[in-house]
């Protein structure tokens, strides 16, 4: 028999009727609780009962169970009721509290379990000890398997698992619970209330989170809807733009087609030979109608004429292309014809100053005189004039000079024959202004004669605008050309006395009645090509400029630009682009004031450029020596005068010699000018001859050019000092847009420096 082992007091306090908690120790060690029960009827035969905790069955190893089974088999020699009772207690102690609870609620199940365990133990007691050992191990395994099945079955019937998740002290509460007294746990209502509060808080948080998610989802829906709407609007806008572009392209194609048709018509009309067509006043229309019809002339109906008036009526010349167009469209109303001639006048209204080459005097008389009209071919020309500014640099913009700024010694009046034509029955009182004409305007004048343009007022207006733009563009180009021609063909610029004498004799031959009108009839020569713009004059002018005052093999060296000129080069171009009609003197004043207003820091880059140009010029021309322009003097009535004194005397003489407007020629700004053909023997008019006066202000042509009042003027130029020019620094080939200032403007530029 086995003796009872010495047990510690904590193990003896616990009886078999109160099993240990299945969740006893946290480390999972096996705790054996033993107690001795002495039966009243078998006082000396008490059998010890070994109680195993619940978690022993869950151990993967079975050493503990084998030791317990060996001790049980050796101590039990016979079956007794106490043994069976202890076995029942062993079975019951191995069950968890939940299983005990289930057993208490279902006694039938508990009895079956007890019976089965008793039978298995009884069977294990029979036979040899080895067999009993094996049978006990089988019983233990069977019990473990059954208890596992019971635990799995009893899981749905357990209390809600939320208590284990939410309660932090569930271990203590379960340890405090008895095996059968589950309802005696203290603090259960409070803990449940706390758990309910926690659950409500979680529910509220989840509800608020759900609302936030729904709100965010709604915002996303709204944002997506707005984006879709924006995309739709953008697509509509793009579609509208594409439609508009398509319409514009279609309109452009239509306009291009119309332009092609008009060009074809112009080409057909342009094959007709252009002639010089005089336009007669209304009272002479009946007399010249037959001859004009024979010669291809066209007489406009829009001009009025008052007999006996002193106002000039220039003889106008219209190309035969316009006559052919008017003849091809006999149904034109007077208003349409007026529009047509208005377009022609707009094309011819060029700012006075630039002259386009015209026809020689012989061709002039032949062109103006039809076969059935008798004209008196009498020409008048002002006496020879001398140039006061012989070495004056080129002035590319027209310099406005009134009647008080002209002198007999300056070639401001060209040597162009004056023609006063009188008809057989009634003489024509006609004078002309000196306004230039454009060769390129023939295209516009021809294009507006087509039927499509004659019936469209907008087209005529557009043609007028184009004509004005073209005349402004070419006016500046012609001014440069005329300045060079004057320098090359002036009387005082002739290199030999032979040339001077030949020009003087030619002038005397052309001089007719000096007291007649000093204005010739306006003419247009449409037979001139673009190559006949005075290219010969340009070449002669350049040859003269390069060889003036030097040896034949000594080239002229330009001075390097200073800082002011470097800065003014671009500024002058900008001002001319903004104000094409601004005179050079005004531009120089503006540039001088601007340069003075600039700070040294702003001028620094231009001074650096000046230093670079000076260094480059010194390297290129190491032997260069600047020779300034000499002072010029004039001999007036045997007296040697400076230019300023001479101009003052001439101004006073002109004021004394002024005559009333009725007997003097009056030039209006809108009058049509005559264009003279520059020839090797006839100098063209300088660009500063007839500048555009103020609107509505007549420019009185003085009579200082009459032979009787012309003083003998001779300009003395020191040949030894003429080599070099003040502002002749850089070639016009390098910068065609650059302007060359005159003496007064150069002085202002030097003061600005």
From Swiss-Prot:
Q: Which GO terms describe its molecular function?
A: DNA binding
Q: Where are the transmembrane segments?
A: none
**Entry keyword set:** Coiled coil, Differentiation, DNA-binding, Nucleus, Transcription, Transcription regulation
Question: Which regions are flagged for Low complexity bias?
Answer: 397-413, 685-699
**Compartmental location:** Nucleus
Tell me, what is an example of a GO biological process annotation in this record? cartilage condensation
Q: Which cysteines are joined by disulfide bonds?
A: none
Principal location class: nucleus
Official protein name in the record: Transcription factor Sox-5
The species this protein belongs to is: Xenopus tropicalis
Top-down, what is the taxonomic lineage of the species of origin? Eukaryota, Metazoa, Chordata, Craniata, Vertebrata
């Amino acid at each position: 028999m086995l003796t009872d082992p010495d047990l510690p007091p904590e193990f003896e306090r616990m009886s078999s009727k109160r099993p240990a908690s299945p969740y006893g120790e946290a480390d999972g060690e096996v705790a054996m609780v033993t107690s001795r029960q002495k039966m009243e009827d078998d006082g000396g035969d008490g059998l010890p009962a070994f109680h195993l905790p619940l978690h022993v069955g869950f151990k993967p190893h079975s050493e503990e169970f084998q030791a317990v089974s060996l001790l049980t088999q050796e101590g039990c020699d016979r079956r007794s009721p106490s043994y069976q009772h202890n076995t029942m207690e062993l079975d019951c102690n191995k069950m968890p509290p939940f299983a005990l609870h289930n057993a208490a609620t279902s006694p039938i199940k508990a009895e079956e379990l007890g019976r089965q365990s008793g039978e298995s133990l009884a069977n294990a007691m029979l036979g040899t000890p080895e067999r009993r050992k094996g049978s006990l191990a089988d019983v233990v395994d069977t019990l473990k398997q059954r208890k596992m099945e019971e635990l799995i079955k009893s899981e749905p019937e357990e209390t809600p698992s939320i208590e284990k998740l939410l309660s932090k002290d569930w271990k203590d509460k379960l340890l405090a619970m008895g095996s059968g007294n589950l309802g005696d746990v203290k603090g259960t209502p409070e803990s449940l209330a706390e758990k309910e509060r926690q659950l409500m808080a979680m529910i509220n948080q989840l509800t608020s989170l759900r609302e936030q998610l729904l709100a965010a989802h709604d915002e996303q829906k709204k944002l997506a809807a707005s984006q879709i709407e924006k995309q739709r609007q953008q697509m509509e806008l793009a579609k509208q733009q594409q439609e508009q572009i398509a319409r514009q392209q279609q309109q452009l194609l239509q306009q291009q087609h119309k332009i092609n048709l008009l060009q074809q018509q112009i080409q057909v009309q342009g094959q007709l030979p252009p002639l010089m067509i005089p336009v007669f006043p209304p009272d002479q229309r009946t007399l010249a109608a037959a001859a004009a019809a024979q010669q291809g002339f066209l007489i406009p109906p829009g001009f009025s004429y008052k007999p006996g008036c002193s106002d000039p009526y220039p003889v106008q010349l219209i190309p035969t292309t316009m006559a052919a167009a008017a003849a091809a469209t006999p149904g034109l109303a007077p208003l349409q014809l007026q529009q047509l001639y208005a377009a022609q006048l707009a094309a011819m209204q060029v700012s006075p100053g630039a002259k386009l080459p015209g026809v020689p005097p012989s061709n002039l008389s032949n062109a103006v005189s039809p076969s059935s009209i008798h004209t008196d071919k009498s020409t008048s020309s002002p006496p020879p004039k001398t140039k006061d500014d012989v070495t004056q640099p080129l002035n590319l913009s027209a310099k406005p000079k009134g009647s008080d700024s002209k002198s007999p010694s300056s070639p401001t009046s060209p040597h162009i024959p004056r023609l006063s034509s009188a008809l057989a029955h009634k003489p024509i009182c006609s004078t002309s202004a000196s306004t230039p004409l454009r060769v390129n305007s023939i295209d516009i004048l021809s294009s507006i004669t087509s039927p499509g343009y004659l019936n469209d007022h907008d087209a005529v207006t557009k043609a007028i605008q184009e004509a004005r733009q073209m005349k402004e563009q070419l006016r500046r180009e012609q001014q440069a050309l005329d300045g060079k021609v004057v320098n090359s063909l002036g009387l005082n610029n002739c290199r030999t006395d032979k040339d001077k004498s030949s020009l003087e004799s030619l002038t005397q031959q052309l001089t007719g009645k000096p007291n007649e009108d000093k204005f010739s009839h306006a003419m247009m020569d449409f037979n001139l090509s673009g190559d006949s713009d005075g290219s010969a004059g340009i070449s002669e002018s350049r040859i003269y400029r390069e060889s003036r005052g030097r040896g034949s093999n000594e080239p002229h060296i330009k001075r390097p630009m200073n800082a002011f000129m470097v800065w003014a080069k671009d500024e002058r171009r900008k001002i001319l682009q903004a104000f094409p009609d601004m005179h050079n003197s005004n531009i120089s004043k503006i540039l001088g004031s601007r340069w003075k207003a600039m700070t040294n820091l702003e001028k620094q880059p231009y001074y650096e450029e000046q230093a670079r140009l000076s260094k480059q010029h010194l390297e290129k021309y190491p032997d260069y020596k600047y020779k300034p322009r000499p002072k010029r003097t004039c001999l007036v009535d045997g007296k040697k005068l400076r230019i300023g004194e001479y101009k003052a005397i001439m101004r006073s003489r002109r004021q004394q010699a002024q005559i009333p407007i009725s007997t003097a020629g009056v030039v209006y700004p809108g009058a049509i000018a005559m264009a003279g053909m520059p020839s090797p023997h006839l100098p063209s008019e300088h660009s500063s001859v007839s500048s555009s006066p103020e609107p509505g202000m007549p420019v009185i042509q003085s009579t200082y050019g009459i032979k009787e009042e012309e003083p003998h003027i001779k300009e003395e130029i020191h040949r030894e000092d003429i080599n070099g020019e003040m502002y002749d620094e850089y070639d016009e080939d390098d910068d065609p847009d650059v302007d060359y200032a005159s003496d007064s403007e150069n002085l202002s530029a030097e003061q600005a420096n």
